[in-house]
Amino acid sequence: MLEPGRSRGAEDTAFRKLIDSYCEAWSTGTADAPAKFYAKDNGLVFYDVAPFAYHGWKELHDGVQKEFLDNASEIKLTAGRDLKVTGRGMIARTIVPMHLMERSKNGKTTEMDLRYTGIWEKRGASWVLVHDHLSAPLAGS
């Protein structure tokens, strides 16, 4: 639980580990690995680079696997050092720049800087994503 006015050191350290584990899970190349980070409720929306939105975990899982991960021979998602954590009680928001390296099965390598915002809810002993938003800045910005 995030408590207002309390030292944030422990929470920031915990969320740093959580975000790094989240990136490691997506870097496995299968959408099954990061499943533990996502709430499975109906009606949740997750924004991605493409397509615009996924409605629920199943749609996110299947869409990212088919459109992105199945075409990759290697994926590496890395969170930047500038992690911001804010929240109160059972809800937290994380904001962090990320870097993605993707090597396609045809050998082409693509790298991009990304912006990431996650909305987390504490459920039992775990924090799970109830919304996230991944975006890429326009070229030249």
Question: What kind of region is each of these model predictions?
Answer:
Residues 54-55, 101-104, 137-141:
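A short local loop/turn or secondary-structure capping micro-motif enriched for an aromatic residue
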Residues 1-40, 140-141:
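Short, low-complexity N-terminal intrinsically disordered segments enriched in polar/charged residues
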Residues 93, 112-140:
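Short beta-strand edge/turn micro-motifs at domain boundaries
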Residues 77, 89-100, 114:
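A short hydrophobic beta-strand element
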